[in-house]
Amino acid sequence: MEHVSKRSIGQFFKRKTSTVDGSKSQKCGTTNQLRKLLHKRRVQKQAVPVESQYRIPGDFRDNQSVRVKNSMYNSSPSVTPSTHHINERYVRYDINTRPLVVVLAISIVFFGCLLVLKDIIIQSSENILSVSKWKIIGASFMGTPYTGLLTGLVGPLLSPFSAVSSWLSFIF
């Protein structure tokens, strides 16, 4: 009796896909790996002129001189080096978005706390204003609509400054 190999749960649920040409199965990979497989299996049938193989990068010539040299060696016109296809490299730029998400989450929590603190700041400013009005103007002024008006004017003026200063202290 043959020994059956034990497979872990992770190996059991691994997804298998067929290769690009469908000949055999392979594990799932990134698109870069698939591009590299395509690149390796591609047969290059393009004729590369001998002159273009030894060209120095940055050595620019006009197409007329290239055609004249090619016509001297070959009777038929050939492909100029300017139309010669260079093998591409597939470069994947990975952008690490985790710091951006962390900063965004912290700023959302921070502004949420500011919304909660805004009510506390307004209540404390109302208390401060009412006490100062009672001391300066007198008790007859308390309870009138002017108290709410004054608090409504002073509260929004003070809260943006506190929000900006606390945000700047958080950053620096």
From Swiss-Prot:
Entry keywords, A to Z: Endoplasmic reticulum, Membrane, Transmembrane, Transmembrane helix
Stretches that traverse the bilayer: 102-122, 146-164
The UniProt record lists the keyword Protease: no
Localization, UniProt: Endoplasmic reticulum membrane
Residue ranges, Lumenal side: 1-101, 165-172
Cytoplasmic side, ranges: 123-145
GO cellular component: endoplasmic reticulum; endoplasmic reticulum membrane; nucleus
Further details from the record: Present with 704 molecules/cell in log phase SD medium.
Protein name (database record): Uncharacterized endoplasmic reticulum membrane protein YNL046W
Lineage: Eukaryota, Fungi, Dikarya, Ascomycota, Saccharomycotina
